[in-house]
């Protein structure tokens, strides 16, 4: 959030990843459904229907703040090399941090939707992100 707010360019635009998010509205909808419907106990993953890339997230955050996104598509191999050097020199951008920033983390919400008898969550991921950023 602060990187985008300060207008700092995102240099990892060459990496395409997908991440699951959960809007507060969808979370409240699911909690209400669990309280009011006869849902079997179990482990359910919670998430919006659409996974977003970090590049999409930054673009949405910028849109919500009325800013232009600054997404730089620095060469992937060069960034991996810089991160490797960062690991050796104990710098903030290292191999582990680069992996965490660029890896996929997508969960399926199919089980909870099936349990609640719905086809889609009420709020799209992009709309949830926009609402959240505008609330700050």
Predicted regions, residues:
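Substrate-positioning beta->alpha
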Residues: 12-35, 41-42, 127
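A short, basic/aromatic helix-end/turn motif that makes direct DNA contacts
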Residues: 62, 117-118
